[in-house]
């Protein structure tokens, strides 16, 4: 960074004027409100509305984040898929505590979730794997996620090789590919407001139900 031509970002800001979130807008079950917001994100044609930041912690206590696509949600939690040799999967084996974050900037909204990750069954993984486009199934075989490689050509050559190999018939599920369901412990809904007096509501698991609290911005 040039000392004589510093890129000043301190004054980059905008006003949040898309309305508020009031207690009367809330649902008893947070997944109902999540679904409403997700549908509105899709209707607004946001790019990748199911993209979420997944945060895990390694054995040294160092947090790590990456963007992953949400593929399913229900009363049992939020579901995503990954290579089981990836950094995230290894970290979840050591510490299944996890957080998810949906940044719907264009709607001045965020949803933050904390919980515990549980491995999906082989049947659940297989069902989803075979619903994916064929090239995506092949790519799962090609990439040993997070492994160091010297050139992109290695991936492309392997992809073409496996595309020929799997030209006919069903592509088998790799043993190193799976998924997780995140059981929900807290879920926070954030709505941007004027003068930075944002609306925040926190749902916290309370037995079979949810405790709901408004948080100061």
UniProtKB/Swiss-Prot annotation:
Alphabetical list of SUPFAM superfamilies matching this protein: FMN-binding split barrel (SSF50475)
Keywords per UniProt: Flavoprotein, FMN, Oxidoreductase, Pyridoxine biosynthesis
Cofactor: FMN
Oxidoreductase among keywords: yes
GO BP annotations, alphabetical order: pyridoxine biosynthetic process
Binding-site residues, substrate: 13-16, 71, 128, 132, 136, 196-198
Superkingdom of the organism of origin: Bacteria
Catalysed reaction, written as an equation: pyridoxamine 5'-phosphate + O2 + H2O = pyridoxal 5'-phosphate + H2O2 + NH4(+); pyridoxine 5'-phosphate + O2 = pyridoxal 5'-phosphate + H2O2
Pathway terms, separated by semicolons: Cofactor metabolism; pyridoxal 5'-phosphate salvage; pyridoxal 5'-phosphate from pyridoxamine 5'-phosphate: step 1/1; Cofactor metabolism; pyridoxal 5'-phosphate salvage; pyridoxal 5'-phosphate from pyridoxine 5'-phosphate: step 1/1
NCBIfam families recorded: pdxH, PRK05679.1
Family annotation (PANTHER family): PYRIDOXINE-5'-PHOSPHATE OXIDASE (PTHR10851:SF0), PYRIDOXINE-5-PHOSPHATE OXIDASE (PTHR10851)
Function, as annotated: Catalyzes the oxidation of either pyridoxine 5'-phosphate (PNP) or pyridoxamine 5'-phosphate (PMP) into pyridoxal 5'-phosphate (PLP).
Family membership: Belongs to the pyridoxamine 5'-phosphate oxidase family.
Full protein name: Pyridoxine/pyridoxamine 5'-phosphate oxidase
Gene of this entry: pdxH
């Amino acid at each position: 960074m040039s000392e004589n031509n510093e890129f000043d970002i301190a004054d980059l800001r905008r006003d949040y004027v898309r309305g508020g979130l009031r207690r009367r807008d809330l649902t008893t079950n947070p997944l109902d409100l999540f679904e409403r917001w997700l549908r509105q994100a899709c209707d607004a044609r946001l790019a990748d509305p199911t993209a979420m930041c997944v945060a895990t912690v390694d054995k040294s206590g160092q947090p790590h984040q990456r963007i992953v696509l949400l593929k399913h949600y229900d009363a049992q939690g939020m579901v995503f898929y990954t290579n089981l040799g990836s950094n995230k999967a290894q970290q979840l084996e050591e510490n299944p505590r996890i957080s998810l974050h949906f940044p719907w900037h264009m709607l001045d909204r965020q949803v933050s979730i904390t919980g515990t990750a549980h491995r999906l069954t082989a049947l659940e993984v297989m069902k989803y794997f075979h619903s994916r486009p064929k090239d995506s199934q092949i790519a799962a075989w090609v990439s040993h996620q997070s492994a160091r490689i010297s050139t992109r050509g290695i991936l492309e050559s392997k992809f073409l090789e496996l595309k020929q190999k799997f030209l006919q018939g069903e592509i088998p599920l790799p043993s190193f590919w799976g998924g997780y369901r995140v059981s929900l412990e807290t879920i926070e809904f954030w709505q941007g407001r004027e003068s930075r007096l944002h609306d925040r509501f926190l749902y916290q698991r309370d037995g079979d139900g949810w405790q709901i609290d408004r948080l100061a911005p």
